[in-house]
Amino acid sequence: MEWKEHITVDPNVCHGKACIRGTRVMVSVILDNLAAGVEPEEILRDYPSLTREAIRAAIAYAADLAGERVVPLWA
């Protein structure tokens, strides 16, 4: 999955947070919903500007970020 095709960061959109290209839906909103157990189909209903590919791109983006640094869990 090439998430760069679907995700953009623009300082003038959503305070510079990562968003799905062509929308104002932040990647964090998608990830928060998935983490809360919301099914992708429900996310697509709630945010009709999204696609399945956009949801997969958000997950791929998060996976790349997770590989970039270690977050100490003992702190």
Residue ranges of predicted features:
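Long, charge-rich, low-complexity alpha-helical segments
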Residues: V25-A75
